[in-house]
């Protein structure tokens, strides 16, 4: 059976997706820590649709209906 291969999300290097790589989907601990650091410094963000903030602005109590 052929081992699945993916690209490291940080550097793009080809990586085997199996138990022999403890850092998957990353190629190394270095790439894994770089990615973690980018989340910690808020370089990555999940887009806000603005729907929740609109509800809070319209309802001063902040409670949901």
Curated annotation (Swiss-Prot):
Coiled-coil zones: none
Region (Disordered) residue spans: 43-65
InterPro entries: DNA_gyrase_inhibitor_YacG (IPR005584), Znf_NHR/GATA (IPR013088)
SUPFAM superfamilies assigned to the protein according to its UniProt record, in alphabetical order: Glucocorticoid receptor-like (DNA-binding domain)
Pfam families according to UniProt: YacG
Any GO BP: regulation of DNA-templated transcription
Ranges of compositional bias, category Basic and acidic residues: 48-65
Keywords noted in UniProt: Metal-binding, Zinc
Protein biosynthesis found in the keyword field: no
Binding site for Zn(2+): 8, 11, 27, 31
Cofactor note: Binds 1 zinc ion.
Keyword Metal-binding attributed: yes
One GO MF term attached to the UniProt entry: zinc ion binding
The protein's required cofactors: Zn(2+)
Similarity comment: family membership: Belongs to the DNA gyrase inhibitor YacG family.
Function as written in the Swiss-Prot or TrEMBL entry: Inhibits all the catalytic activities of DNA gyrase by preventing its interaction with DNA. Acts by binding directly to the C-terminal domain of GyrB, which probably disrupts DNA binding by the gyrase.
Subunit-level organization: Interacts with GyrB.
Name this protein carries in UniProt: DNA gyrase inhibitor YacG
């Amino acid at each position: 059976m052929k081992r699945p291969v993916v690209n490291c999300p940080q550097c793009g290097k080809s990586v085997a997706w199996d138990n022999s790589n403890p850092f998957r989907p990353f190629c190394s601990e270095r790439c894994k820590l770089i990615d973690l650091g980018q989340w910690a410094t808020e370089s990555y963000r999940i887009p806000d649709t603005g729907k929740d903030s609109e509800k809070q602005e319209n309802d001063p109590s902040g409670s949901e209906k």
